[in-house]
Regions:
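Glycoside hydrolase catalytic-domain context in secreted enzymes
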Residues: 1-94
């Protein structure tokens, strides 16, 4: 979404999980989806289909982060299965 103009940037998933705030995470996901719909509607209205104008969302990875050698741990909600499942559900609901 960034190449298609301005977009809101939120912290990595592991940082959001560190808040332990399920309601906040749902609000973040809602903001992301609302902004995405707005960009899509604007593209359709103005027929702006140039290269790099498609919508790409980098959502959290719900794998459990167990091995620190895995280089994508920052994309997860961490190593707690309960927290990861709870936050994953709330992100989808948002």
């Amino acid at each position: 979404m960034v190449r298609a103009g301005t977009a809101t940037v939120f912290p990595q998933a592991v940082s959001l999980a560190a808040t332990f705030d399920e309601d906040f995470l749902e609000e973040v996901a809602d903001a992301i989806s609302t902004e995405g719909r707005a960009k899509f509607n604007a593209q359709q209205k103005y027929e702006d289909f140039d290269i790099y104008k498609g919508l790409t969302f980098w959502s959290p990875n719900v794998n459990i982060f167990r091995d620190p050698r895995w280089g994508r741990g920052h994309e997860t909600f961490g190593e707690d299965p309960y927290l990861t499942s709870t936050l994953g559900v709330r992100f989808v609901e948002g």
